Design a protein with these regions (language model features):
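Basic, Lys/Arg-enriched alpha-helical interface segments
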Residues: 1-67, 76-80, 87-125
């Protein structure tokens, strides 16, 4: 099974700021997510502490010794939503800064699904 992946404008903006080789490294991580879905485990993916959403995850990509992170979640439609990404090199507060942004983006995504009537009877996590 191939898992459907969507992304936010915030993720796209970050993606467009990357050089081609960084994009290729991120793309390799995203392809693993597409293939394995929620069963993608450490070291490629892990949970995110400090998120309001219990299912918030991160793709863990290394590029040239730098930890590039993509925060994502599976929505009630079982699609992976790439929310936001960044380089956490030397930033001990990266999760404190980015997890709330990812939470807000996921909340916006869920609200869009609600407006479209796609959440009727679906569990929100």
């Amino acid at each position: 099974m191939s898992w459907e992946i969507e992304y936010t404008d915030a993720f796209e903006q970050w993606w467009n700021s990357l050089i081609e080789r960084e994009q290729e490294a991120i793309d390799a991580s995203v392809r693993l997510l597409e293939i394995l879905g929620p069963s993608l485990k450490f070291p490629h993916s892990s949970g995110v502490n400090g998120s309001r959403h219990g299912r918030m995850r991160e793709l863990r990509t290394q590029f040239g010794g730098r930890p590039l992170r993509t925060l994502y979640a599976f929505d009630p439609m079982r699609k992976a939503i790439l929310l936001i990404g960044g380089d956490k090199t030397g930033n001990d507060r990266w999760y404190d800064e980015y997890a709330p942004m990812a939470d807000d983006l996921y909340d916006e995504h869920l609200e869009e699904l609600r407006k479209e009537g796609l959440l009727d009877g679906k569990e929100i996590f």
